[in-house]
Amino acid sequence: MNVRQRASIYQTIERLLRDGQISVKETLRETGKPDRTVYEITNEGREILIEWIREVLSTPIQEFPNFPVAISYISLLSPHDALEKLEQRIDVLEKTVQQIDNNLQTYKSLIPRLFMLESEYQKTVLAAELEWVRSASEDIRNGSLFWNDEWLSDIAERLTSKEE
């Protein structure tokens, strides 16, 4: 479930209520503050959640993040521009991996590993992405990965002439 905006959180709650997957546990009232509703998962909701977890854990699916799409169109940028953007991504990835690692180190003696698996996974995935982006950036920097309009036109011409 992708919940990115406040409105979609309320829509998600309404749908879960409508479908009987959650129910209202209580409504808390404080003077001068809006009512706060506390929800709890229903037995049906728990069964659906457990089945979803089993499915997602056991079956790799093709997800569609934006980064691979941008990579497929990187030739629309100049190598210089692409390198600049990839270096910005490296900075963000380095900081994020370091932050996750710091959190893992800080809490490993306090929190059982079971509850840190998500962070471990995120760190591993981001570290792999960081390694790839560094490699591609270095290849652009040293000229072993290069393109320009003339080269792209030549490639397009060769590929289309082979199709005919």
Where are these regions (language model features)?
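Amphipathic alpha-helix face/heptad-repeat signature
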Residues: 12, 86-89, 122, 129
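Basic helix-turn-helix/winged-helix DNA-binding cores
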Residues: 1-62
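Acidic interhelical loop/turn segments
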Residues: 100-121
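Extended, charge-rich alpha-helical interface modules
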Residues: 101, 120, 125, 131-164
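Amphipathic alpha-helical coiled-coil segments and their boundaries
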Residues: 79, 86, 112-115, 119, ...
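Amphipathic alpha-helical dimerization/coiled-coil segments
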Residues: 50-98
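Non-transmembrane amphipathic alpha-helical segments
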Residues: 86, 93-104, 126, 133
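Short, flexible helix-adjacent loops and helix caps
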Residues: 27, 54, 79, 105-109
